[in-house]
Amino acid sequence: ENFNDPKNIFNTLMEYKKILLNENHKMNLIGKSTIDDFDQRHIIDCIQIIKHMPDKKKQVMDIGTGAGLPGVLLSILGYQNLHLVEKSPKKSAFLETCKAHLGLNYKIHTKPIAEISGVNIDYITARAFAPIEKIITATKKIIHKKTIYVLLKGKSYLSELNLINPQKYSWKNYPSITSEESKIIVLGIK
């Protein structure tokens, strides 16, 4: 399938949305209050990170994928070496359903992030998962000197960044296009 064709991408995104909303009542993948504003709150919010991840061939890991946000969306947008980490077997089964129905290509890890090793990840993404410091600690076994964290963060981002050692890490925060109090934190190892 041609993931560079905007019409194909759009149709696949809408098909994903349909699957997610259909399954949502069974396992609460997204908050009910966010359903009416799904495209803005979830799709646009997640895909705004791709400008910080220009190389779609690199190894990408989305931790705490849950409903597939942003992991499944990154796959729809053509990222080729994706690892989705979701310790809940129910949610992993949902990610498997999306993969099969939408013809996507990603590896699902149904275990806590700290238990994963043997991969060298270039980009790490997370949305509504854990404080930045916990994400860094949990991913120690899978990173290298050039790994970049691209994290979608809410209003607590500043207090989270205050706990990060500026001698070891450098970061920039970018405004979110979907929420004034949210940021995209792009963090690298010094």
Briefly describe each language-model feature range.
Residues 83, 156-190:
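Active-site capping/gating segments
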